[in-house]
Amino acid sequence: MLATTAALMLAGTTSAFATECIAPANAGGGWDFTCRQVGKLLYDLKLVDAPVQVTKMAGAGGGLAYAHVVADMNTDPDVIVAASSATTTRLAQKAFGDATADQVRWVGAIGADPGVIVVAKDSPFQNLGDMVAAIKADPGSVAFAGGSAAGGFDHMKPLQVMKSAGFTEITKVKYIGVDGGADAITQTIGGHTQAMTGDMSEIVGFIKSGDVRVLAVLTEARVPGFEDIPTAREQGFDVVAVNWRGLYVPKGISDDQFNAWATKLQAVADSAEWKETMAANGLAPFTKVGADFQGWVDGVIAETETLSREIGVIQ
């Protein structure tokens, strides 16, 4: 049972209510980080009148919290729930049973761990185009290592790149899922795979040591601090794949309540304090709130469903 939270008032609204952030996992993970950091800044920036309570609700990879919010908190304007790319991937792949992404409202993302395509320092591939051309010529010649299982978010990144290049036989793209990004990059540095697909935070140390080269970062713009790494987009491949950090809210709240949360998140994203938090934790700027984020999530879900069907993850 969720703990009761103290009542408080969101600045700029007329009704006092409790603010609770549900982290759908145990302490220490990305969702816990989102709740704690965003919750802290909501209070520090005086966007709420009392500290935000963080409730941990681990289970089913986020599915337990999702089901609870849908079933028991559908009209509650007092709750925000931490989410990420893993949440939308699991929804698209029916990992939460019959749950669908339209059972909640996606209120905002305010930071992201950028997706990357990486090769060892001595790889013959000098840019993303070289790699794409090699896969088109011989799909079996390039194997990607990634820290998620087949069909997971890391697997999707090279598939999105290949689809954007007009390659339709994506089931022929080789992917080896290993136990996390560290194992994936070790496989590539060791020559066991030709490339690694993962997140920027997983490879920063290897970039600094010179063991790897990043062929592309899968963001809308180059990442601050890594301005020498080109985006996939500027190389002709229209792919943005980031492990965003954000929040959803119950489906049944009013538009005014939804927009109020979007405004609060935008204020957090714009703050110097949040920029410091991102820099200290390896996150890149990625801000989408309100209807903009909702529409973006809808597109991501549809694309993930399509790719997942094509590779047989879902029927």
Report each predicted region and the residues it spans.
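Bacterial N-terminal signal peptides that target proteins for export
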Residues: 1-3
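An extracytoplasmic/periplasmic, membrane-proximal ligand-sensing/linker region
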Residues: 255-315
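Periplasmic-binding protein-like
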Residues: 109-116, 216-251
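Hinge/capping helix and adjacent helix->loop/strand transition within the periplasmic-binding protein
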Residues: 44-48, 68-79, 91-183, 244-277
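A ligand-binding cleft/hinge motif common to bilobed small-molecule-binding domains
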Residues: 85-96, 155, 159-166, 194-227, ...
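N-terminal signal peptide c-region/cleavage motif recognized by signal peptidases
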Residues: 11-14
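N-terminal (or domain-start) structured segment
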Residues: 17-103, 141, 167-195, 287-288, ...
